[in-house]
Amino acid sequence: MERIKELRNLMSQSRTREILTKTTVDHMAIIKKYTSGRQEKNPSLRMKWMMAMKYPITADKRITEMIPERNEQGQTLWSKMNDAGSDRVMVSPLAVTWWNRNGPMTSTVHYPKIYKTYFEKVERLKHGTFGPVHFRNQVKIRRRVDINPGHADLSAKEAQDVIMEVVFPNEVGARILTSESQLTITKEKKEELQDCKISPLMVAYMLERELVRKTRFLPVAGGTSSVYIEVLHLTQGTCWEQMYTPGGEVRNDDVDQSLIIAARNIVRRAAVSADPLASLLEMCHSTQIGGTRMVDILRQNPTEEQAVDICKAAMGLKISSSFSFGGFTFKRTSGSSVKREEEMLTGNLQTLKIRVHEGYEEFTMVGKRATAILRKATRKLIQLIVSGRDEQSIAEAIIVAMVFSQEDCMIKAVRGDLNFVNRANQRLNPMHQLLRHFQKDAKVLFQNWGIEHIDNVMGMIGVLPDMTPSTEMSMRGVRVSKMGVDEYSSAERVVVSIDRFLRVRDQRGNVLLSPEEVSETQGTEKLTITYSSSMMWEINGPESVLVNTYQWIIRNWETVKIQWSQNPTMLYNKMEFEPFQSLVPKAIRGQYSGFVRTLFQQMRDVLGTFDTTQIIKLLPFAAAPPKQSRMQFSSLTVNVRGSGMRILVRGNSPVFNYNKTTKRLTILGKDAGTLTEDPDEGTSGVESAVLRGFLILGKEDRRYGPALSINELSNLAKGEKANVLIGQGDVVLVMKRKRDSSILTDSQTATKRIRMAIN
């Protein structure tokens, strides 16, 4: 107060004001502060002070020929005085206004192309909807987020090469454009930017925005995709939030979202196959997301999610060193531990063999809806500070931390037997057994944990076993906080190894990820995911399996046909027929298979006729291990659309319908493709006419001597076999019919069989 009075007193004297306003500042320290270094110390003041001058801008001398000396109002636009220290002229801000209104027009065609990201942002905001503002405490946690909507996913180096190639194509310097995306973008941009007058530097900056993912570590409550992050300043403050729905989506968010869905589907499917790692790699390599190969996306996309990281590990890529348990990402922030196998008894006296972490450690736990800080010693939870969106999310985090602590009271809280299995029907490891058990019901766990009196600490509150908040008591060591726990900020990646059961370990052998950690959440992908692997046919249900199986046969008919006649066993064992087996009722699979294989053998041998449609239709049934029985079937059942549907052995059905005139096959009403050769061709060429009374058995067989001409055939006795030369110099093996009754069919059969034998 005294100082203020003193100052007021000083100011009331007229001389003081004069001294302060008129005297020059010549204190050395001040002069030094504002003049040393090239960095402007007070930019906004400098700007205001400059703009208050009459001619704050300098311009090239040529401007005096392009701009009049005075505008319509008679105000001077430029000074006749030269700028001190350069040969430029001094210009008034009014000159800029004049130029904007009356200056030359240039073509604006390139602007939307160069400033694409800005134009798109304006569109998104224009069509976005802002909802009401709510005032409430915001639990924000820092997460690494994408701040640049609408970008491709090139690495900085790849983008640099593309930019140099597009903007400065004639500059010297080694540039290697290797990836498909690099080449596509370069070609596209070169075409777009022909005759572009915008400065190359500006073009380069804007291209960088379009090509590279930029991430920042920002406090976020709510959506983390880039279209939300670009309006972060509008949607959440310290004590308020505003609802917002983006007015458009961007490809990079869609890629991230679709990649997670594809990876989850692939890991879940691989986990139940005979060789999970090989299957996973096969699927990753044969899958496309939005038209781009999944493996290319995995190499470039930094998304960290359990399934995505398992796929990356399988491809030998580095991943984050944090590990996953119970859907939370754990990152050790201090301490260390050694692992030791220990046997313990549950409350149900079941023995569990658990790898115990011995030593003091601190972790951050980050989940989708809750975060926590955990301090633990050997089999002891010391402290857990949780924050989350709601009671349910907080409870989830507490359960995971309690199981992770490996405390005895947690193991003793198990009621009943632990026998949880994974998708492949294998028992889960003990830690996941415990986790599943308590996720189902944590009442006993919370009740047995113990409670304690708590001190009043700002921003922290206790939580009771029934999850109600309390200021006096809390479950032992557990507190709920208003503040979130930040995600681990470092983006370091480490080399990992993966075993055939998809368990990912760091170099010290700690398990970072396993298929148990992959979320079961189902979502709908934003971009089309094309799984070419037959293992993924069942992802869209039984109908998809049916259609895909038959489409595969039709697409590969040429090779299938040859295998059918020469090496059927190999054909029956093809993995493409595996998914189909799940559609055939278990009890009858073996009989169907035996029946179809016998039928096929008859076709190959003497009796009956070769019928393409029938082979295609029945082939998938022959893949199951056959049971020998004398049973005959006129129709075979498949389980689709919630019930058994019939496929007729001879003739069409709603499930399998072949149209002879259009040559199109429809499965359950869906188009399954065209057969290139018509199975029931009635063309009787010379051969079929002459070969009436003979059965074509297959390719030439040298044991039956040199090829006869068609005319020499008449000398054969019934049942005798011979090689015969037909049509275009091809040789086939034939046999003279024993009975004349079947002669009629021969001319139709012959054409087909000749074609089969030749091919």
From Swiss-Prot:
Disulfide bond positions: none
Q: Which Gene3D superfamilies match?
A: Polymerase Basic Protein 2, C-terminal domain
Entry keywords, A to Z: Cap snatching, Eukaryotic host gene expression shutoff by virus, Eukaryotic host transcription shutoff by virus, Host gene expression shutoff by virus, Host mitochondrion, Host nucleus, Host-virus interaction, Inhibition of host innate immune response by virus, Inhibition of host MAVS by virus, Inhibition of host RLR pathway by virus, Inhibition of host RNA polymerase II by virus, mRNA capping, mRNA processing, Viral immunoevasion, Viral transcription, Virion
Query: What's the superkingdom here?
Result: Viruses
> Where on this chain is Nuclear localization signal (motif)?
736-739
According to its UniProt record, where is this protein located? Virion; Host nucleus; Host mitochondrion
Q: Which Pfam families match?
A: Flu_PB2_1st, Flu_PB2_2nd, Flu_PB2_3rd, Flu_PB2_4th, Flu_PB2_5th, Flu_PB2_6th, Flu_PB2_7th
Q: Which GO terms describe its cellular component?
A: host cell mitochondrion; host cell nucleus; virion component
The family assignment reads:
Belongs to the influenza viruses PB2 family.
HAMAP family named among the record's database cross-references: INV_PB2
Q: What is this protein called?
A: Polymerase basic protein 2
Q: Could you tell me the gene encoding this protein?
A: PB2
